[in-house]
Structure formats: C-alpha cells, structure tokens
Amino acid sequence: MRALRCSIIRGVAGLRMASSVLDEMKEQMLRRSKEDHKKIGDLRKKHGHEKLCDATIDAVYGGMRGITGLVYEPSLLDSAEGIRFRGLTILECQEMLPKAPGGKEPLPEAMFWLLMTGEVPTEEQARGLNAELHRRVDPEAIAAAQKAIAALPKNAHPMTAFSVGVLALQTYSKFAAAYAAGKSNKKTYWEYALEDSLDMLARTPAVAAMIYNRETKGQVELAAPSNSDLDWAANFAKMLGFQDEEFRECMRLYLSVHADHEGGNVSAHTTTLVASALSDPYLAFSAGLNGLAGPLHGLANQEVLKYLFSMQERVKADGVNVHDEAALEKALTKYTWELLNSGQVVPGYGHAVLRKVDPRYTCQRNFCLRHNFQDDLFKLVNTIYMIMPGILKEHGKTKNPYPNVDAHSGVLLQHYGLTEQNYYTVLFGLSRQMGVLAGVVWDRLQGRPLERPKSITTEMLAKKYLCNSL
C-alpha cells in the first residue's frame, strides 16, 4: 500500500514536472495525433464498410496468418523493403538518426523518439531524452526488482527473471496509481502510459544487466554502476561489465534494429491486447515478454547458433580450413544439401512476409565487415550467406531464400564474448519494449477500445459447411 500511495503522489505530480524535452515530445505526438484523428474519421465515415481482407477457414485455423485485423502505428513490414519505422527503412534510420560522438550506429533513444513521435529527433532532443531517462532511474524501484529476481529458483530462465523484474517495477506505475485514485480519464490515459513507458525504459537496463550477472556469476547485481554521462546503450553495456567502445556500438546497433517489427507478432500483439483492457504498460509488457520467451518467437537466433556450431564441428572434423574460402564453400554446400534432403530447414533463412535479404541482417553484416571480423563463426555465416540463396532456389521449396535478422545477431554477440545464449532473448525484449510501448501509448492517445474478436468452434463450422455439402 505504501508503494501504491507513493506512486499516486508521483503519478499525479509527475505530469506537472515534465521536462522541456518531454514537452517537445508530447507536442509532436499531439500534432500527429490531430492529423491522424481527421484521417481516421474520414476513413471510418467514408470507407468504414470496405473490406481489408477475407478471413478464410484456412486462415482462422492457421494462426490468423495473413488476416489484417490490427492498427499499429510505430512500424510496418514491407515485403519489398523490410521493416519501416514510422515510414523509414533501416538504412534511412542509420543515416538520419542521431549517433554517439564518433559513432556510426543510431542511438536507441533516438529510435524510441522516432517510434513515439513519428519524427526524427535532433541531436539536442536525443541528448535531452537520454538525460530524461537518467533522471528517471529510481534506485528504490530497481531494488524492488532486484529483490524479486533474487527470490526466484536458481534454475529460473533469464526471461522468467525479466518478466518478474518488470512486474516488480509495476508497483511504481503512474498509470495504475492515477487510475486507482480517479485522477485519469480517456483523454489523459496516454500521458500516464507515456510516463510509465519512459520510467520503464529508464529502469529496465539495470534489471536486464542484473539478470546477466545472475546468469554469469550467480549474483543479482550490476557488474558496474550506472553512469549518467553515457547514452542508453553504452550505459547498459557498462552495467553488463563491457567497457569496449566497439561493443557499445554493437549494442547501439542491436538495440535499435530489434526495436519493433509491426504489431501482429506474438510479443507486440500480446502487449497491445493486454493494454487494451487498461492494464498499465508494465503489466502489458510483462505479458509480451512471456510471449517473446516462447521458442517459436524469441529463440530463433539460438537455433541459428546451434546450427552454426554444428557446421563448425563438421568443418573441423573434416579438416576444412575456414579461411580457405573455396574449400569452406564446397564443404558447406555439401552439408546444406544433406540437411535439405533429410527434410530439415536451414535456420535463419526465410521470412513470413519479406521477400529479400532482411535489411537488419545486412546492417549487422556490414558492421562485422567494417570492424574486420576474422573469427571462425563469422567466416561460416558469411560463406553461408554467399551460397545459401542459390541452393534454396535450386531446392525450390521456399518463397524467400534469403537470410533474416536471426541469421546474424547471435554471431555479433558471440564475437564480443557475450556467449550466454539463454540471455539473448532478454536483449531482444529490452530492445522490443521501445516499439510495443510506443504502440500502447498511441492506442491510448487515439482512444482505441478493448480488443474483443469473435471466436468460433469446429462444430459450428462443420454444421455450416460440411452438412450442406453432404
């Protein structure tokens, strides 16, 4: 109760104490919302009866794949260009978003600004947002998460710890406190959702870093204290225990490109669905993390690494020199055909929507080339990249023979010594909160209702279609 009372006080006061950079963010959001409000009104008035898609029986039994049933503002997946963050491609984001001094990768806080407002922030706005996030770091809230994580069984998965940590932070929710106190309404829900989102973005890096130390050393604590002089990704890297500037750049890239991926994937849709019940952003994001923890969603890069390690063992056993490009290409071609002919798939290749090389893969590959990676794992993944599309086209059983983001992300982390594969999904979640929380705030800003689709039964379908066909 004490935490709830404190949250009520902070929640009501927090909106009055907004910094100038937060005022700028809100101003941009309100301006765009006003424009969208007119568009939405016109769309519903003039075209509300138009069909977006046909929901076939195959589709409802097939995980609703291909059914257009959601409006999600932060990003859109283009089958030709890949993910677009507020209309910008990955390459455009890399070129246009503010960077750290001397760096080439976008700052994740700049990406968050873009996802939240729809506008590219200035250097000053990106720095101001970083300062705002540092201001919101609350030792008391982080200590609550630390205590909750420390109470878990030793064999608890890092994603279990992350979800529990976020739920512990929830006791400081300004959205929940204001709602309980009767201080919020439909017109102000979005502001409290934004407050919670900023607080969460400020506090989850420390929670994630403590989980890493728990995984590597058995202690739920930071490897190094937070440093308010550093940007969001660099400070996270420091709390993990990595001091190398090149690794900081790696984290800026990794956390930026994984920030969002449209609204229909499990973690984004779960977060959106739970938040539609006016559950606060902490509850919603924790639910999204639980979806992300599923092996069909967040574990793909680990599957790729298992595949690469198995290839590495075969290459070694066959006496192939990974630095002999021709010999390596010949060996990997042989192994790949054996894999495909046995009925298995190549992890990291193919995509449900995209029909070209995933731009997120490309930017990671370019990072490795720019920093002159020479380790065996990169040699493997790079050679596979050169030969795989041709093999898969010849095999003829895939619509997209090109690599996706998961084909490379684990290789980056392995190179810098972050080898704990069970932890990788925590990094994914830390990044993905930027997109899904922006989506939650915009749902509240646009006044979206409780999500409640209609369900049917097999018996009902059988009576309607099978009985009439007999």
From Swiss-Prot:
Pfam families, sorted: Citrate_synt
UniProt keyword Mitochondrion present: yes
Domain of life: Eukaryota
One example GO MF annotation: citrate (Si)-synthase activity
Compartments (UniProt record): Mitochondrion matrix
Gene Ontology cellular-component annotations: mitochondrial matrix
CDD domains, per database record: ScCS-like (cd06103)
InterPro entries documented for this protein: Citrate_synth-like_lrg_a-sub, Citrate_synth-like_sm_a-sub, Citrate_synthase, Citrate_synthase_AS, Citrate_synthase_sf
Pathway: Carbohydrate metabolism; tricarboxylic acid cycle; isocitrate from oxaloacetate: step 1/2
EC numbers, comma separated: 2.3.3.16
GO terms classed as biological process: carbohydrate metabolic process; tricarboxylic acid cycle
EC class of the enzyme, as a word: transferase
Catalytic residues in the record: H297, H351, D406
Reactions catalysed, as given in the entry: oxaloacetate + acetyl-CoA + H2O = citrate + CoA + H(+)
Keyword field: Mitochondrion, Transferase, Transit peptide, Tricarboxylic acid cycle
Miscellaneous comment as given in the Swiss-Prot or TrEMBL entry: Citrate synthase is found in nearly all cells capable of oxidative metabolism.
Oligomeric form and interacting partners: Homodimer.
Family under the similarity heading: Belongs to the citrate synthase family.
The protein's name: Probable citrate synthase, mitochondrial
The organism of origin for this protein: Leishmania infantum
Taxonomic classification: Eukaryota, Discoba, Euglenozoa, Kinetoplastea, Metakinetoplastina
